[in-house]
């Protein structure tokens, strides 16, 4: 079986997913938790990783192909030269692994104070800015009376223990 991408109607990803699953089609609709500030309050919301798209796993000879486009919420099958674009299994697995990594990284948020464990900045406090891929982070450190942005391995930072001030 092979993975393919489907485009769904705006704001109807969950509807398309439910109808596809009702037809016993194997689906993958990757979502991540995002933190947003709305009306001055931080809220966490689950959002699609690829807005407007979900993935299905089918054989090319599967009779379900003809039903895909008429499934509620589905717009079209992503195709090139009128042929559905196959997505390699390893790409889907990488997306799944990345979702797991993103969930694990959820412990450190932008603006949070962190401490560096290794390298030339060992023992220095910093402010976490962002993730830079799966294995690096961007932090802001005070260095020679200046704020400096530095990229460091994610494994070298941890949330700063409370009770300590700089």
Language-model features: where?
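Short coil-to-beta-strand transition motifs
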Residues: 117-125
């Amino acid at each position: 079986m092979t993975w393919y991408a489907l485009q769904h109607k705006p704001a109807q990803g969950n509807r398309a997913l439910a109808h596809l699953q009702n037809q016993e089609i194997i689906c993958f609709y990757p979502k991540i938790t995002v933190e947003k500030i709305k009306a001055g309050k931080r809220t966490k919301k689950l959002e699609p990783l690829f807005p407007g798209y979900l993935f299905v796993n089918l054989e090319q000879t599967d009779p379900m192909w003809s039903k895909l486009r008429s499934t509620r919420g589905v717009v079209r099958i992503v195709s090139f030269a009128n042929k559905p674009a196959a997505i390699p299994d390893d790409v889907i697995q990488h997306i799944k692994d990345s979702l797991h990594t993103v969930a694990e990284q959820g412990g450190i948020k932008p603006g949070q104070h962190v401490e560096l464990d290794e390298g030339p900045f060992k023992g220095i406090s910093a402010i976490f800015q962002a993730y830079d891929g799966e294995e690096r982070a961007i932090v802001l450190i005070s260095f020679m009376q200046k704020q400096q942005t530095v990229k460091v391995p994610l494994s070298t930072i941890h949330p700063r223990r409370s009770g300590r001030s700089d």
